[in-house]
From Swiss-Prot:
Cofactor: binding details: Binds 2 Zn(2+) ions per subunit.
GO molecular function annotation: hydroxyacylglutathione hydrolase activity; metal ion binding
Cofactor list: Zn(2+)
Protein name, per record: Hydroxyacylglutathione hydrolase
SUPFAM superfamilies per UniProt: Metallo-hydrolase/oxidoreductase
Lineage: Bacteria, Pseudomonadati, Pseudomonadota, Gammaproteobacteria, Enterobacterales
Source species of the chain: Pectobacterium atrosepticum (strain SCRI 1043 / ATCC BAA-672) (Erwinia carotovora subsp. atroseptica)
C-alpha cells in the first residue's frame, strides 16, 4: 500500500491510500480540487471515500468529487448521512476495499458519532488523535474521548497514525509547557520545529512514538498526575485527561 497526504484548507490533510493496481481510497476530503489533482498526478482511480465525521473540513469536497466519479461509494458514520455518505457503518463493521479490509472503530468525543478506520498498519482517525495531542471535545464528554483514545492505544506500536490536521508543533509546545523536563517531548519539539520551518509535514506519526510524546496517551503516569493535580494518588486517569484537555483549550 502507498500512502499520500494531501494538504488542504488551512491545516487539514486529506489521505489517499492506494494499492499496486493504482486504485485508492480517499479519506476525509474537506475540499475537492487538491484530491482531483492528486488523483490525476498519480494516475489513481478512486474506489471509495471514507468519512470519519460530519464536520465540513472533512466532507466539504464530497459532492464535487462525486460529480467526477458519480458511482463512487461513500462510507461514513450515521452523522454523515446528510454529507454524502451512501453506506453507513459502525463499530464492528469491516469495509472491503483495495482487496483488503478496513475495520471500523467508534471513537466518539470530538463528535458523537466519530469513527476511525484501521487497515493494519494504517489508522485513519480524523480529529480524535493528533500527534502530541487530541481533538477538541465538541459533542461528546471528556470520559468518552478518553475511552476512545484508549481504544486506539490498544493498537500495535507500528500503527501508522494518519491524523487530519497539522497541529503537531502547537501540541508539543503545550506538552513542553506542562512537562518541560521530559526529554522525549523536548527532543521532538526541537525536531518538529525544524521540520515546520521548512514547511514540511510532521505526519503521519506512529503509535509507538505517540506513547512517548503524547500526554493524552500518558494519563496513567503518576508523574503526569503530579504535574496537574494536588491529589495525584486519588485522581482517575480520565480525570487527568479532562484536566489536560481543559488546559489545552486555554493554551
Amino acid at each position: 500500500m502507498n500512502l499520500i497526504s494531501i494538504p488542504a484548507l488551512q491545516d487539514n490533510y486529506i489521505w489517499l491510500l492506494s494499492n499496486k493496481a493504482n486504485r485508492c481510497v480517499i479519506v476525509d476530503p474537506g475540499e475537492a480540487s487538491p484530491v482531483l489533482n492528486a488523483l490525476d498526478q498519480n494516475a489513481l482511480l478512486p474506489e471509495a471515500i471514507l468519512l470519519t465525521h460530519h464536520h465540513n473540513d472533512h466532507v466539504g469536497g464530497v459532492s464535487e468529487i462525486l460529480n467526477h466519479y458519480p458511482n463512487l461509494p461513500v462510507f461514513g458514520p450515521k452523522e454523515t448521512a446528510k454529507c454524502g455518505a451512501t453506506y453507513l457503518v459502525e463499530e464492528g463493521n469491516t469495509v472491503s476495499l483495495l482487496n483488503s479490509e478496513f475495520s471500523v472503530i467508534e471513537v466518539p468525543g470530538h463528535t458523537s458519532g466519530h469513527i476511525a478506520y484501521y487497515n493494519a498498519p494504517f489508522l485513519f482517525c480524523g480529529d480524535t488523535l493528533f500527534s502530541a495531542g487530541c481533538g477538541r471535545i465538541f459533542e461528546g464528554t471528556p470520559k468518552q474521548m478518553y475511552e476512545s483514545i484508549q481504544k486506539i492505544a490498544e493498537l500495535p506500536d507500528d500503527t501508522v497514525v494518519c491524523c487530519a490536521h497539522e497541529y503537531t508543533l502547537s501540541n508539543l509546545r503545550f506538552s513542553n509547557d506542562i512537562w518541560p523536563e521530559d526529554p522525549d517531548i523536548e527532543s521532538y519539539l526541537h525536531k518538529i520545529s525544524q521540520i515546520r520551518e521548512k514547511s514540511q509535514s510532521s505526519l503521519p506519526t506512529t503509535l509507538g512514538l505517540e506513547r512517548r510524546i503524547n500526554l493524552f496517551l500518558r494519563c496513567h503516569e503518576i508523574d503526569l498526575k503530579r504535574k496537574i493535580s494536588n491529589e495525584p494518588e486519588n485522581i482517575e486517569n480520565w480525570q487527568v485527561f479532562k484536566m489536560l484537555r481543559s488546559k489545552k483549550d486555554c493554551f
